[in-house]
Amino acid sequence: MKLIIQPDDGPTVLLSALKNAKKSVEVAIFRFDRNDIETTLKAAVGRGVKVTALIADVNRGGEKNLRQLEMRFLQAGITVARSANDLIRYHDKLIVIDRRILFILSFNFTHLDIDHSRGFGILTKNATLVQEAVKLFEADCARRPYTAGPDSFVVSPANSRKVLRTFLERAKKQLLIYDPQISDKEMIATLQGRAKAGVEIRVIGKMSGRANVMVRKLTRMRLHTRTIIRDGHQAFIGSQSLRPAELDSRREVGLIVREPKVVKQFLETFESDWNAMNGGSAQEASKEEAPSVTSQKVAEKAVAVLARELRPLTGTVKKAVKKVVAQAGEEVLHDKIVKSTVKKVIKKAVKKAVKEAVQDSEKA
C-alpha cells in the first residue's frame, strides 16, 4: 500500500501506473483537465489496453467539459459510460489497473487539485478491495444497484454513514480530521460525545456546532481531502465529507486504512499542516508563504478563464435588451429607473452564479 500526498507527489505515481497497464484501465471521473493523464490514457489504448471511463453526468458548472471529454475519449477508442442521475452526484474518484491495482483518491484529475491543493490518494493491491472496486465500477457503468461489501470499502450512500459513525465512536484517545465542511448532525453529535469522553479532536477545515472540538482553517494551500486519523493507528481516506448529502445522496468512495507506515504519513502531514497554522517554525512559515505566488498565478488564470466564459453573456444580454425594446419601445432605454433596474438585475444574477460556482468548487 502506498500513500500519495498532494501537492507534493503530483501526477507521477498515477502516470507511471497507467503507462505500465497491460490489459485494462477503469477510471471514474468527476472533474478532469489534465492533458498528461488524457494523453497517457489514449496511449494505453494504442498499446491494446482496454480503457473504460465512467464519467459523471453532472458536476455543476463543468458539464460542457465533461461532454467534450467524452467525445475525445470515444474518438481515441476509449469506452465511455455516463453515470446515472439517480443520485445528486457521482463524486467518486478511482482507478483500477489490470484488475489488480486500485487507486482511491480524494482529488480530481485537475491541475487545481493535484498541483495546488492538499489531497491524498491510496494505491493498493489488496485483492478484496480491488474486487469490490470492480464490482462498484461495473454496477455504476451498467446503472445497476450496488450492494455494500466489506466495511473497509466505504461507499455512499451504501454504507458510509454506518461505517464512519462507528469509526468515530471507537476512538479512544484522538481523532485528527481533514474535512472542508462537517455539518451532519449525527456525526457532529458523535464527535461531541467523544470529546466529552476525553478524546482529543482536531479538525482542519470547517465544522458546525464545534463545542469541545479544535478547528483550524488550512491557510497554506486549498483543502481538498476528507481524511480521519483515529488513535494514530487507523485512517479513513475518501471523497465524502461528514455532510448529509455526501453520506446519503451522492456516490462517494473511501477506504479504511490500517497500514502502519501509511497511517504514520497521514499523521505527520496533519501535524505539519496544523502547526503551520499556529506560528510554526521558521521553516514551516516559509513554506506557508511560498504558495502565495502560485496562488496569485492561479487567481490570474482563473480570472482569464472567467473572462472567456463570460463573453457569451454579452450576447445574451443584448438579445434580452432587444426583446424588451421590441415589446416596450425604445423610450425604455432613456428611462433612468429602467436602466438602473436592468443593471441591478444583471449584477445580482452574475453575483449569484459566481457564488454558487465557488461553493460548488469548494465542495467538489
Where are these regions (language model features)?
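Residues on the solvent-exposed faces and adjacent turns
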Residues: 29
